């Protein structure tokens, strides 16, 4: 069994990495290293999310950088998020060209279908 070295969490479309559910998970997992990241559109002050490929690339970038900062492979990192953040994590793992290999996936309020469908 792989040991878990840390967790990376991503927010939903309408919130930031300081959303109460992400903060609660962060606090509950202490002292395990936990990183919470905002997506690029949020950091740029845009009201609407980027397209999925941009969001998925952001997930991969943050997870790989976090694993590197801990000196472990991504296979020792658990990733997840709330709503859209969780969906993008699941899509990063399922990517057929460049799948993100992780220890586990946490989904909170996972959207089973795209908005308004």
Where does each model-flagged region fall?
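Serine-hydrolase catalytic machinery in alpha/beta-hydrolase-like enzymes
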Residues: 1-76, 87, 91
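Primarily recognizes the serine-hydrolase "nucleophile elbow" in alpha/beta-hydrolase
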Residues: 62-117
